[in-house]
Amino acid sequence: MADVLDLHEAGGEDFAMDEDGDDSIHKLKEKAKKRKGRGFGADEGTKTRIREVYDSVEQDGDEPGPQRSVEGWILFVTGVHEEATEEDIHDKFGEFGEIKNIHLNLDRRTGFLKGYALVEYETYKEALAAMEGLNGQDLMGQPVSVDWGFVRGPPKGKRRSGRRRSRSPERRRR
């Protein structure tokens, strides 16, 4: 069995303790900024978050209207034939203006289209003309539905208040 050598008994000054080291660690910890949670922004005004303003078209009435995405005006086309190609959609929608981007999702299992497409225009006028001109029209023998990809929500000033249901007979008696 091996002998165990105790360093303190052997008079080993090899491992001298730095007593000043503890003070420097405490000083560093005092200067360090305490951070908690996601983003470390608890005290730096996270409640006053800056909202980006996107272009939207003013409309009369309570209906939500179209809203511009970061890149452009996007149309959501549904009812697209599963064997349609990007060229077919480009030919049909290209009549109304310059197409900035077309996105088609394919089904991984079959390799065919999932039945919808996203068509992006630079200007509102081109997108509106395409939507009005092609909504309900046939594309490869199938009628397509064209609508805005992004819409504004309902107006914030007009909210319902109070009860939405009638009171039960038991509650009316009280």
Curated annotation (Swiss-Prot):
Keywords: Cytoplasm, mRNA processing, mRNA splicing, mRNA transport, Nonsense-mediated mRNA decay, Nucleus, RNA-binding, Spliceosome, Translation regulation, Transport. It comes from the Eukaryota. Pfam families: RRM_1. Residues 28-38, 155-174 have a biased composition (Basic residues). PROSITE patterns: RRM. Its main location: nucleus. Part of the mRNA splicing-dependent exon junction complex (EJC) complex; the core complex contains casc3, eif4a3, magoh, and rbm8a. Identified in the spliceosome C complex. Associates with polysomes. Belongs to the RBM8A family. This is RNA-binding protein 8A-A. It comes from Xenopus laevis.
